[in-house]
């Protein structure tokens, strides 16, 4: 997770510079190529609606309220694809259409817990 190690401190600093209270570390996933192990992801933190971020490298993004399918995933990140596959199977079985981005909220992880079995990631799929 070197991407997050590099970028989350910048995101947190810019949010604090805006005098806002950041929520938990979050990933916004816009594309995921499982075959090639590549993703288009943004490091993010939730902030109060209307927060103005005055930064050339960090921007505020509004994600409108939506119906969602959520899964709490416990474990190391190298097995998280199993949770995604289960969610996608559920969406297909229930004829739900996935909206972009999907959201990962890192409730516990390497920054605050060494035992990977205690890592908790909340995965949120916005749906139509």
Give the ranges of each region predicted by the language model.
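A solvent-exposed interaction/effector surface
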Residues: 1-128
